[in-house]
Amino acid sequence: MMITLRKLPLAVAVAAGVMSAQAMAVDFHGYARSGIGWTGSGGEQQCFQTTGAQSKYRLGNECETYAELKLGQEVWKEGDKSFYFDTNVAYSVAQQNDWEATDPAFREANVQGKNLIEWLPGSTIWAGKRFYQRHDVHMIDFYYWDISGPGAGLENIDVGFGKLSLAATRSSEAGGSSSFASNNIYDYTNETANDVFDVRLAQMEINPGGTLELGVDYGRANLRDNYRLVDGASKDGWLFTAEHTQSVLKGFNKFVVQYATDSMTSQGKGLSQGSGVAFDNEKFAYNINNNGHMLRILDHGAISMGDNWDMMYVGMYQDINWDNDNGTKWWTVGIRPMYKWTPIMSTVMEIGYDNVESQRTGDKNNQYKITLAQQWQAGDSIWSRPAIRVFATYAKWDEKWGYDYNGDSKVNPNYGKAVTADFNGGSFGRGDSDEWTFGAQMEIWW
């Protein structure tokens, strides 16, 4: 009996812990895709992306296993005030073998505090690594406004006619700065911290079913004392964004206009780049030197056309004009219609076209890609996941230019620059060809 009495406090503590854990359950969210594919000419599945384009049409055109695993929990709540801890670890492998070791990417680790400031009800204060208010086109996996990274901010401040958000994040560049080494030689082995300061005004209702979001991002190289940047570094830049979202046909349409300068032009999404150098296979390559400007006009959305048809679509024009003439003009257009045979089975087709003109050569690369997939998904929406699909993809391309990465930047003056397909008797770009692939894939988010 004495033994039983001694164990009683432990049993009570365990029971209390279990009840507490149930009351504060861990949230498990994430994304994953994986599959197997073959190429018509033999070998594993190839994926098709136009040289110079920043994305590709993804249906039946993804050749890796990728996953994001998110664990989060509301760790404290008192009335309408709360603290939430959120994490995200991402993995990517080539899906070529059973055992594929990889280093995970720790993409999110942040705390968000809601309603902590009495005179700003409804606002959230946060700090840590975070996916911050990302804007993307799903069907081409293209993030056009994304300042994610380590940072801090205050968001969703109610200003009456909209919600104001303020944030600062960071993205560092390898090889961006240097201090004196021996014999007054600069050795560019130090990282440069690039800061981004973001201001957004969202949820402004300007027409029935329509909202407007405006944003300004300023990025700069934050250089340490007694350090210097590589020659031609852009140092800083701006990104201006205007996005109109319209509810239409049980879905949405987004119309976006963006203008960027200098360091904000390379990625064109709000992260500063250009204070450092680019690397190719871990060796010094060339100065990014991205002084200039970028204009992007984008329209995309997803709609429902009756009980049996859904469709995604995108149309975009992007002009990156650099002082060094190494920019591009890229325009793309595509649709992804879906016919629903039953609430859980559908046929999906994706047709996409890319055209990229080199500022330096004036030549154009183009590609069209068509995918037909039979799909089983958890629901009758084009957004329903998980989904298992079997697919066949055909791509046809004709490329007249490519980037010269031959030799070393110290002896090749054209290293990293656009050149014609037959420059100096070489072969740049992918030429004029076509290919088809087929396979199966699963995709899930939860």
Swiss-Prot record:
Induction: By maltose. One of its GO terms (biological process) is monoatomic ion transport. Transmembrane segments: none annotated. It is a multi-pass membrane protein. The record marks 31, 66, 99, 252, 383, 445 as: Greasy slide, important in sugar transport. Homotrimer formed of three 18-stranded antiparallel beta-barrels, containing three independent channels. Keywords: Cell outer membrane, Ion transport, Membrane, Porin, Signal, Sugar transport, Transmembrane, Transmembrane beta strand, Transport. It comes from Escherichia coli (strain 55989 / EAEC). GO terms for cellular component: cell outer membrane; pore complex. The gene is lamB. The record marks 143 as: Important in sugar transport. The keyword Ion transport applies. Belongs to the porin LamB (TC 1.B.3) family. InterPro entries: G_neg_Bact_CarbUptk_Porin, Maltoporin, Porin_LamB, Porin_LamB_sf. GO terms for molecular function: maltodextrin transmembrane transporter activity; maltose transporting porin activity. This is Maltoporin. It catalyses: beta-maltose(in) = beta-maltose(out). Gene3D superfamilies: Porin, LamB type (2.40.170.10). CDD domains: Maltoporin-like (cd01346). Involved in the transport of maltose and maltodextrins.
